[in-house]
Each structure stands twice: as C-alpha cells, then as structure tokens.
Design a protein with these regions (language model features):
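An extracytoplasmic/periplasmic, membrane-proximal ligand-sensing/linker region
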Residues: 177-179, 183, 189-194, 263-308
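Ligand-binding "clamshell"
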Residues: 105-113, 119-134, 213-215, 227-241
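Bacterial signal peptide processing site
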Residues: 22-25
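A bilobed periplasmic-binding-protein/Venus flytrap-type ligand-binding module shared by bacterial periplasmic
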Residues: 143-153, 247-260
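Paired acidic/hydrophobic, glycine-rich loop segments that form the ligand-binding mouth/hinge
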Residues: 92-96, 216-222
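Bilobed "Venus flytrap"/periplasmic-binding protein-like clamshell domains
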Residues: 39-71, 138-209, 213, 292-296
Length: 308
C-alpha cells in the first residue's frame, strides 16, 4: 500500500511539475486544438536514463520532420511515474519497454517469452486504459546482471543462481526502483531464492564505475549499453526468466492518434523498424562513452536512414 501511495503521489506531483515547466508551445494541461483545425503539439515524454532520452529524440525529430509539432519532455521518471503522467493527461506519448510495462505497470507476472505474445498482452492492457501501442522495435534492451571477469572467475559464476554460492553479501549497484521491482530484487529472491543480495542505489550509468572500483560486486545493466561492446564485463545467464523481453514500443493516447492522423503511427513505426540492437548499442556508446548530445546522435541516425 505504501508503494502504491508513493507512486500515485509521485505521479500527481510530476503532472503538476510538467504543467509548470511546459515549453512555449505547451500549455501543460490537456491537449487542445491550437488554432482552427491545427492539432496541439504532441507532448512526448521519456524515461530517466540515456537510452530513453535518445529514443525520445529519435521519435520526436522524425515526427517533426513530417510536420508534427512536438514538445519533448526528457527524463520524466521511471515507468511507474511516466505512465501515471500519461494516464493523468500530462503526456500524449512516450517510448516504453514492453516487459517492464507488463510487470511493473500492468502487474502481469506471466512473463511471456515470445516477444509477440508479450506485445499482444501489453497492447491489450493499454487498450483497456484508453491507449495504443505502436509498432515495436527489433532490438530488445533486456535488463541483466553484470559482474567483472575477475569476480566471475574467483567465485565460479556463470548464471544468476550462482550468486547464491558467493560468501557473505553480494552488493548490486542498481537504480532505486530495482529494490521494489519484480524485474529486480523481488524477482531475484522469488525465482532464485537469493537472500544474500543487497542493493546499492546508483543513478543509471554509474554502475559500471562502481563495478570497476569494487564498490559493488554486481550491477543491474541494460543489454544495449555501450559499455558492453568490449569484454570488460560478464553478463550472467537468467535461466529462470526474471528479466523478460524488452522490445520498445511507443504508448500513445487515442486522442493524439485522431488529432495527428495516420502519419503519427506511420512515422513512429518507420523509426522503430530501424532500431536494431547493433544500432542502439552504437548510439548509446556515442552518448554515454563519447559524451555526445542525444539530439545530435539521433539527427545523424535519422538522416542516414532517410527519415529526416
């Protein structure tokens, strides 16, 4: 109950914050017709980590190239928070990870292993809420647990279950919501019986530095992280399926679809089709490791793909 209350209060506070900090083209309230038959700007949010911000830039820039006015609101928050902003009318659309949508928003722990089955379940949930899932990406940025090669060798670790054999506590660097999510500490304890795990709250992106320094023993990561391009880290296998399929699909309000016509879905789907795992890992590396702006990285990708 406490978690639910915190999520609701957080969502309400967020909605007020979004309304207060809207751009010049955004009233912050429910979308209305701007003038005559011209639809109001599409209010797009993103979750609060680099890949999510990059996705927002990709979708928003492609839509703007087609004449859709977009107000991009990056770093809104976790799935629980940003979905509350969507249902509360502060946003019209945002890119979401299907597995997280099912487990943390829809509270569906069935964990379909087939991406198409997961998509159908997520779409059915959103339709009941008055929203629609657009086409999903080829890439799946699944959650995973990473350790250093040295730690893996010292303890003979290959799978998540092997963490149970590590003497003493295993410190996992992860974002704060990891401690209360099924795709996190809750699922790891339920599916693997791991009682020796302790979380160290870290901002997304800082877990690799914590691994390198020895501050943590393991880290919650995303499989398209640019840091995983080399062999500096070992991803532990997840045979019991705590971390589900994480293809991305924009969640959009039906009103926005009506207001902006078929070009909204067609343009977003065209972007999604180009987002392979290789493309995302490369762009993530440019943003996180090379320090480039997500806006510039997205612009280059869209121009190469002839989507801008």
């Amino acid at each position: 109950m406490r978690r639910l209350l915190l999520a609701v209060v957080g969502g309400l506070v967020l909605a007020l914050a979004l309304a207060a900090c809207g751009g010049a083209d955004d009233s912050g309230g429910p979308a209305t017709r701007a003038s005559g038959d011209e639809p109001a700007p599409l209010r797009m949010g993103t979750k609060n980590f680099p890949e999510a911000v990059l996705l927002g830039e990709l979708y928003s820039q492609a839509l703007q190239a087609k004449g859709v006015r977009v107000v991009l609101k990056p770093n809104v928050g976790s799935s629980e928070i940003i979905h509350e902003a969507l249902t509360g009318g502060a946003l019209d659309i945002y890119p979401e990870y299907i597995g997280v949508l099912l487990s943390e928003v829809a509270n569906d722990r069935s964990r379909p292993s087939d991406p198409r089955a997961a998509y159908r379940a997520a779409d059915a949930f959103e339709e009941r809420q008055g929203f629609t899932l657009l086409g999903m990406t080829p890439f799946s940025d699944s959650n995973a647990i990473a350790v250093t090669p040295r730690f893996a060798r010292e303890h003979g670790i290959r799978t998540i279950a092997d963490l149970g054999r590590v003497p003493g506590r295993v410190r996992i660097g992860a974002p704060p919501e990891f401690a209360t999510r099924f795709e996190g500490l809750v699922g790891l304890r339920q599916r693997y019986g791991l009682r020796n795990l302790r979380t160290t709250p870290l901002m997304i992106g800082r877990q690799y530095r914590a691994l390198d320094s020895g501050r943590v023993d393991a880290a919650a990561v995303f499989t398209t992280d640019g840091q995983l391009s080399g062999k500096r880290y070992v991803l532990l296998e997840d045979p019991r399926g705590v971390f589900g399929t994480q293809h991305v699909a924009p969640v959009v309000s039906r009103k926005a679809l009506r207001d902006h016509g078929p070009q909204l879905a067609a343009t977003a789907d065209a972007v999604s089709r180009r987002l392979t795992a290789r493309a995302m890992r490369r762009m993530n590396a440019e943003v996180v490791l090379e320090g480039r702006e997500p806006r510039a990285v997205a612009d280059e990708f869209l121009r190469r793909a002839k989507l801008k």
